[in-house]
Amino acid sequence: GLWQKIKDKASELVSGIVEGVK
């Protein structure tokens, strides 16, 4: 559902931030 899409987007954002910090 919608919540799953939001969680997926949040995970993508977190992964992007983590990669940027490395």
From Swiss-Prot:
Q: What is its main location?
A: secreted
Q: Name one GO cellular component term.
A: extracellular region
Protein function: Antibacterial peptide with narrow spectrum of activity. Inhibits the formation of NO by neuronal nitric oxide synthase.
Q: What is the official name of this protein in its record?
A: Caerin-3.1
GO BP, sorted A to Z: defense response to Gram-negative bacterium; defense response to Gram-positive bacterium; negative regulation of nitric-oxide synthase activity
Arranged from A to Z, the UniProt key words for this protein are: Amidation, Amphibian defense peptide, Antibiotic, Antimicrobial, Secreted
Family note: Belongs to the frog skin active peptide (FSAP) family. Caerin subfamily.
Which residues get modified to Lysine amide? K22
Q: Where is this gene product found? A: Secreted
Q: In which tissues is it expressed?
A: Expressed by the skin dorsal glands.
> Where does this protein come from, organism-wise?
Litoria rothii (Roth's tree frog)
